[in-house]
Amino acid sequence: MILRLLPPLLLLGAVGCSRDTFFQPDARVAYPAPLPPGADSARVTAGRHYKHGPLNTLLLGPHYRQTWSQPVTLPVFKPATVVAGGLKFEKLGGGFQTTSMTLVDPSGRSYALRSIDKDPYKTLPKVLRQGFILGTVRDATSAGMPYGAFVVPPLAEAAGVLHTTPRPYYVRLDEQGLGHASERLQGDVVMLEDKFSNKNDRVDALREAEEFEESDVVLSERYKNQKNRLDESAYLRARLLDLWIGDWDRHEGQWDWAAFAQPDGTRLWRPIPKDRDQVFFRFDDGLLSWVVSRIVPKFRTFGPHYQSIEGYTRNARFIDERALASMTKEAYLRTAKDLQQRLTDDVIKQAVRQGLPKEVYQREGARMEANLRARRAQLPKAAQEFYRLQAHQVVVPGSDQEERFVVERLNDTATVVSVYGQAKGGKDSQGAPLLYQRRFNPRDTHTVVLHGLQGEDEFIVSGSVAKSPFIDIYGGPDEDIVRDSSHVGGLRKKTRFFDTARNNELIGGKETKDRTEHSVVSHAFDRDGSGR
């Protein structure tokens, strides 16, 4: 990615800022005059260092520079009184661009405190961590709306999406109440946000949750056994909300999950979006930044139209693939239309008015509201395009327990994939639970990828048709069996088996392509985004 961006970055760097001291020394407008000890509020700017002259603004883009440099009044962060009983420092966060830390109250409830401004220094190769390039990449932070995250909670609430409720503060330049980490946020504009990491963190909507985990843990649990499932309907709803507000940075690390016990003994994990740093993004409004946006489609401006659904969803490709596998076109359109009904003009107006500081609302409020209304009208069309991208290749994983994958090529417009779990009476008994089922149309879906993972799995493919998606079968490390009696018109074989050459049984037909090999890499599956 950095290599692709290097030519336009060099262009941008030619006009970018190369100051060694890039960031404002204190967010307060009155700096260096000291803030009175008992002050409850302060007049601050989120980042007046992003304000540039006419030439730089023409080339790099106006972005949200005026909003970053707009003086606003924010409450002073007081660790001892910000919540009942006060907050104490627990640990530093691991973010590369923002400074973050975990704080806890006396009941054990945890919060995240993090800077609104970013420093991408650590994300760059060492050779680029200086001069024009560093200054330009730092300057790109001004494309983010610094107060956008505070607009989202009422919108998410109306949409039926679980959410955190961040609040903005100013940290005194002489604040010492955060222990040895105090100096990391002194003089900064920050947000305080709920964390969902233990049972003490429950809010009303999560009162019945058994457990909270991050995506890597949840995915590991999902693939370990058949008792853990992802709430794909809730995830789809959250992702369409992401599209509507232009949040393109929704990778797997941007989600918490809450586990809810189900009557059948399974656990349903519901998503909780977090870290709304990139909502209402405004980037391709300069001559050179426009060039960059054509190279990297996710860097588009939040406006009345959805400029690139592929760009908006690229960062979330991994988690989307794993959390939307059963969602049909009808589900996408039904959810989009439901959101249209929920996200009324009044909801939009109240969210924007309450979320933005009044000085920022006067500048940006009307434009943001108009864009949200226009995008709401186009949401079903955006959802249909999102479906098209997700439906092209669908990954259907099993678990580390035994499963039976049944593929029925019914006709030229319908191939049904069903996954069955273990029956109570044993492998060959009746009544095996249905874990997954979806009907695929080859006009929408090119390939369905089946992963057995661990356990001795069985794959059965049948039916004679003229058209069908490719069925790619990856058995896993244990002994698996594939039975393929299907036939699809044309010269290409549409059932492909990928696994190790030994310890598997392949009963294939004319439609089967044997892609087995000696390496265990042949059936590798990335469970949690680590690449392992």
Task: Name each model feature, range by range.
Residues 77-213, 267-268, 272-314, 439-441:
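Conserved ATP-binding subdomain of kinase catalytic cores across diverse folds
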Residues 2-8:
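Sec-dependent signal peptide recognition
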Residues 18-20:
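Bacterial signal peptide processing site
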Residues 13-16:
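C-terminal motif of bacterial Sec signal peptides marking the signal peptidase cleavage site
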Residues 172-247, 260-270, 282-285, 295, ...:
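ATP-dependent phospho-/nucleotidyl transfer catalytic cores
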Residues 45-81:
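Juxta-kinase regulatory segment immediately upstream of eukaryotic protein kinase catalytic domains
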